[in-house]
Protein backbone atom coordinates (compact mmCIF):
# COMPACT_ATOMS: atom_id res chain seq x y z
CA UNK A 1 0.00 0.00 0.00
CA UNK A 2 1.36 3.41 -0.93
CA UNK A 3 1.29 6.03 1.78
CA UNK A 4 1.52 9.81 1.92
CA UNK A 5 2.34 12.51 4.40
CA UNK A 6 -0.63 13.07 6.62
CA UNK A 7 -2.68 16.12 7.38
CA UNK A 8 -2.88 17.06 11.06
CA UNK A 9 -5.92 15.60 12.74
CA UNK A 10 -6.47 16.09 16.45
CA UNK A 11 -9.45 14.42 18.03
CA UNK A 12 -9.67 13.80 21.75
CA UNK A 13 -11.90 11.21 23.37
CA UNK A 14 -12.46 10.08 26.93
CA UNK A 15 -13.92 6.66 27.59
CA UNK A 16 -14.64 5.46 31.12
CA UNK A 17 -14.38 1.74 30.59
CA UNK A 18 -15.31 -1.41 32.46
CA UNK A 19 -13.49 -4.61 33.36
CA UNK A 20 -14.05 -8.09 31.91
CA UNK A 21 -17.16 -8.45 34.04
CA UNK A 22 -20.21 -7.95 31.89
CA UNK A 23 -21.68 -5.21 34.05
CA UNK A 24 -23.75 -2.64 32.22
CA UNK A 25 -22.80 0.93 33.04
CA UNK A 26 -25.49 3.49 33.73
CA UNK A 27 -23.00 6.28 33.07
CA UNK A 28 -23.07 6.66 29.29
CA UNK A 29 -20.57 9.05 27.81
CA UNK A 30 -23.23 10.23 25.38
CA UNK A 31 -25.94 11.63 27.61
CA UNK A 32 -28.75 13.92 26.55
CA UNK A 33 -28.02 17.60 26.86
CA UNK A 34 -31.10 19.72 26.26
CA UNK A 35 -30.67 22.84 24.18
CA UNK A 36 -33.00 25.14 22.31
CA UNK A 37 -31.63 23.97 18.98
CA UNK A 38 -32.75 21.25 16.64
CA UNK A 39 -30.41 18.82 14.96
CA UNK A 40 -29.38 19.89 11.50
CA UNK A 41 -27.62 17.83 8.86
CA UNK A 42 -26.43 18.60 5.37
CA UNK A 43 -27.68 16.11 2.78
CA UNK A 44 -26.62 17.92 -0.38
CA UNK A 45 -24.45 15.70 -2.57
CA UNK A 46 -20.75 16.50 -2.18
CA UNK A 47 -18.91 17.14 -5.44
CA UNK A 48 -15.14 16.72 -5.11
CA UNK A 49 -13.15 19.71 -6.33
CA UNK A 50 -9.73 19.63 -7.96
CA UNK A 51 -7.79 19.79 -4.70
CA UNK A 52 -9.88 17.03 -3.10
CA UNK A 53 -9.39 14.75 -6.11
CA UNK A 54 -5.67 15.47 -6.30
CA UNK A 55 -5.25 14.42 -2.68
CA UNK A 56 -7.62 11.48 -2.35
CA UNK A 57 -7.69 9.91 -5.82
CA UNK A 58 -4.02 9.04 -6.18
CA UNK A 59 -4.19 5.39 -5.11
CA UNK A 60 -2.37 6.22 -1.88
CA UNK A 61 -3.49 5.91 1.73
CA UNK A 62 -3.16 8.55 4.43
CA UNK A 63 -1.69 6.99 7.57
CA UNK A 64 -1.40 8.84 10.87
CA UNK A 65 0.03 7.36 14.07
CA UNK A 66 -0.67 8.71 17.56
CA UNK A 67 0.50 8.04 21.09
CA UNK A 68 -2.58 6.62 22.79
CA UNK A 69 -3.83 7.21 26.32
CA UNK A 70 -6.74 4.85 26.97
CA UNK A 71 -8.67 4.56 30.21
CA UNK A 72 -9.24 0.90 31.08
CA UNK A 73 -9.86 -0.86 34.42
CA UNK A 74 -9.59 2.42 36.31
CA UNK A 75 -6.17 3.39 35.00
CA UNK A 76 -4.73 5.27 32.03
CA UNK A 77 -3.07 2.84 29.64
CA UNK A 78 -0.51 3.82 27.02
CA UNK A 79 -0.31 2.49 23.50
CA UNK A 80 -0.59 3.39 19.83
CA UNK A 81 -3.54 4.51 17.72
CA UNK A 82 -3.44 4.57 13.92
CA UNK A 83 -5.89 6.11 11.45
CA UNK A 84 -5.74 4.82 7.87
CA UNK A 85 -7.83 6.70 5.31
CA UNK A 86 -8.10 5.60 1.68
CA UNK A 87 -10.63 5.92 -1.14
CA UNK A 88 -12.00 2.73 -2.68
CA UNK A 89 -14.63 1.52 -5.14
CA UNK A 90 -17.34 -0.22 -3.12
CA UNK A 91 -19.83 -2.83 -4.35
CA UNK A 92 -23.06 -1.96 -2.58
CA UNK A 93 -24.92 -5.22 -3.32
CA UNK A 94 -22.34 -7.35 -1.49
CA UNK A 95 -21.05 -4.44 0.62
CA UNK A 96 -17.39 -5.21 -0.02
CA UNK A 97 -14.51 -3.57 -1.88
CA UNK A 98 -15.11 -3.97 -5.63
CA UNK A 99 -12.55 -6.04 -7.54
CA UNK A 100 -13.47 -4.47 -10.87
CA UNK A 101 -14.64 -1.11 -12.17
CA UNK A 102 -18.40 -1.22 -12.69
CA UNK A 103 -21.08 1.50 -12.98
CA UNK A 104 -22.89 0.32 -9.81
CA UNK A 105 -19.75 0.86 -7.70
CA UNK A 106 -19.83 3.61 -5.09
CA UNK A 107 -16.76 5.67 -4.26
CA UNK A 108 -16.18 5.54 -0.52
CA UNK A 109 -13.71 6.96 1.94
CA UNK A 110 -12.63 4.06 4.13
CA UNK A 111 -11.24 4.52 7.61
CA UNK A 112 -9.46 1.70 9.40
CA UNK A 113 -8.95 2.87 12.96
CA UNK A 114 -6.76 0.76 15.25
CA UNK A 115 -5.79 0.87 18.92
CA UNK A 116 -3.18 -1.27 20.64
CA UNK A 117 -2.41 -1.02 24.35
CA UNK A 118 -1.57 -3.19 27.34
CA UNK A 119 -3.49 -3.34 30.61
CA UNK A 120 -0.55 -4.29 32.78
CA UNK A 121 -0.47 -8.02 32.06
CA UNK A 122 -2.26 -8.54 28.76
CA UNK A 123 -2.70 -6.74 25.44
CA UNK A 124 -5.75 -5.18 23.83
CA UNK A 125 -6.24 -4.86 20.08
CA UNK A 126 -9.17 -2.87 18.64
CA UNK A 127 -9.98 -2.22 14.98
CA UNK A 128 -12.94 -0.40 13.48
CA UNK A 129 -13.64 -0.02 9.76
CA UNK A 130 -16.01 2.53 8.26
CA UNK A 131 -17.03 2.74 4.60
CA UNK A 132 -18.55 6.16 3.95
CA UNK A 133 -19.85 7.42 0.57
CA UNK A 134 -17.86 10.35 -0.75
CA UNK A 135 -21.13 11.81 -2.01
CA UNK A 136 -21.76 12.57 1.69
CA UNK A 137 -25.52 12.30 1.23
CA UNK A 138 -26.28 9.16 3.24
CA UNK A 139 -25.10 7.15 6.23
CA UNK A 140 -22.04 4.92 6.17
CA UNK A 141 -22.70 1.87 4.01
CA UNK A 142 -20.87 -0.48 6.35
CA UNK A 143 -19.18 -0.35 9.76
CA UNK A 144 -17.39 -3.17 11.58
CA UNK A 145 -15.47 -3.60 14.81
CA UNK A 146 -13.33 -6.36 16.28
CA UNK A 147 -11.72 -6.47 19.72
CA UNK A 148 -9.19 -9.04 20.90
CA UNK A 149 -7.91 -9.40 24.45
CA UNK A 150 -7.21 -12.18 26.93
CA UNK A 151 -10.79 -12.34 28.18
CA UNK A 152 -11.89 -13.27 24.65
CA UNK A 153 -12.83 -11.54 21.43
CA UNK A 154 -15.90 -9.86 19.94
CA UNK A 155 -17.03 -8.77 16.48
CA UNK A 156 -19.89 -6.59 15.28
CA UNK A 157 -20.86 -5.58 11.76
CA UNK A 158 -23.44 -2.99 10.68
CA UNK A 159 -24.76 -3.02 7.11
CA UNK A 160 -26.80 -0.12 5.77
CA UNK A 161 -29.71 -1.51 3.77
CA UNK A 162 -33.44 -0.78 4.24
CA UNK A 163 -32.55 -0.56 7.91
CA UNK A 164 -29.29 -0.93 9.77
CA UNK A 165 -28.66 -4.69 9.89
CA UNK A 166 -26.57 -5.82 12.85
CA UNK A 167 -24.57 -9.05 13.09
CA UNK A 168 -22.88 -9.36 16.48
CA UNK A 169 -20.76 -12.04 18.18
CA UNK A 170 -19.26 -11.99 21.67
CA UNK A 171 -17.89 -14.26 24.38
CA UNK A 172 -20.22 -12.57 26.89
CA UNK A 173 -23.44 -14.54 27.46
CA UNK A 174 -25.92 -11.71 27.00
CA UNK A 175 -24.02 -10.38 23.99
CA UNK A 176 -23.57 -13.72 22.26
CA UNK A 177 -24.55 -14.38 18.63
CA UNK A 178 -27.30 -11.94 17.64
CA UNK A 179 -28.86 -10.52 14.50
CA UNK A 180 -31.25 -7.59 14.58
CA UNK A 181 -32.16 -4.35 12.83
CA UNK A 182 -32.15 -0.72 13.92
CA UNK A 183 -33.79 2.37 12.52
CA UNK A 184 -31.28 4.54 10.72
CA UNK A 185 -29.60 7.21 12.82
CA UNK A 186 -26.37 9.15 12.86
CA UNK A 187 -23.39 6.89 13.52
CA UNK A 188 -20.51 8.09 15.65
CA UNK A 189 -18.22 5.94 13.50
CA UNK A 190 -19.16 7.82 10.33
CA UNK A 191 -18.40 11.25 11.77
CA UNK A 192 -14.65 10.63 11.42
CA UNK A 193 -14.99 10.18 7.66
CA UNK A 194 -17.62 12.88 7.21
CA UNK A 195 -15.20 15.26 8.92
CA UNK A 196 -12.55 14.61 6.27
CA UNK A 197 -14.97 15.16 3.39
CA UNK A 198 -16.86 18.25 4.55
CA UNK A 199 -16.64 19.38 8.21
CA UNK A 200 -19.42 21.94 7.70
CA UNK A 201 -21.86 19.09 6.99
CA UNK A 202 -21.47 17.54 10.46
CA UNK A 203 -24.76 17.28 12.39
CA UNK A 204 -25.35 19.88 15.10
CA UNK A 205 -27.99 20.49 17.74
CA UNK A 206 -29.96 17.84 19.64
CA UNK A 207 -29.42 14.56 17.83
CA UNK A 208 -30.00 10.81 18.06
CA UNK A 209 -26.71 9.00 17.58
CA UNK A 210 -25.50 5.40 17.68
CA UNK A 211 -22.20 5.36 19.65
CA UNK A 212 -19.11 3.82 18.12
CA UNK A 213 -19.07 0.03 18.05
CA UNK A 214 -15.90 0.12 20.15
CA UNK A 215 -17.72 2.11 22.84
CA UNK A 216 -20.68 -0.30 22.80
CA UNK A 217 -18.43 -3.30 23.43
CA UNK A 218 -16.12 -1.76 26.02
CA UNK A 219 -19.00 -0.27 28.01
CA UNK A 220 -21.31 -3.29 27.60
CA UNK A 221 -24.28 -1.09 26.74
CA UNK A 222 -27.10 -1.88 24.27
CA UNK A 223 -26.41 -1.14 20.62
CA UNK A 224 -29.00 1.53 19.86
CA UNK A 225 -29.37 5.27 19.37
CA UNK A 226 -28.92 7.62 22.33
CA UNK A 227 -29.72 11.30 22.70
CA UNK A 228 -26.85 13.78 22.53
CA UNK A 229 -26.09 17.36 21.59
CA UNK A 230 -23.52 18.34 18.97
CA UNK A 231 -21.81 21.66 18.35
CA UNK A 232 -19.46 22.79 15.61
CA UNK A 233 -17.01 25.64 16.12
CA UNK A 234 -13.88 26.75 14.34
CA UNK A 235 -11.38 23.93 14.69
CA UNK A 236 -13.53 21.72 16.94
CA UNK A 237 -16.57 19.44 16.97
CA UNK A 238 -18.09 18.40 20.30
CA UNK A 239 -20.60 15.74 21.37
CA UNK A 240 -22.22 15.85 24.81
Task: Walk through the language-model features, giving the residues of each.
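Residue-level signal for mature regions of secreted extracellular proteins and peptides
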Residues: 13-14
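Extended beta-strand-rich segments in extracellular/periplasmic secretory proteins, especially
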Residues: 82-104, 207-240
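C-terminal motif of bacterial Sec signal peptides marking the signal peptidase cleavage site
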Residues: 17-19
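Bacterial N-terminal signal peptides that target proteins for export
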Residues: 1-9
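Contiguous hydrophobic, core-forming segments of folded domains
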Residues: 34, 38-85, 106-220
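Bacterial signal peptide processing site
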Residues: 21-23
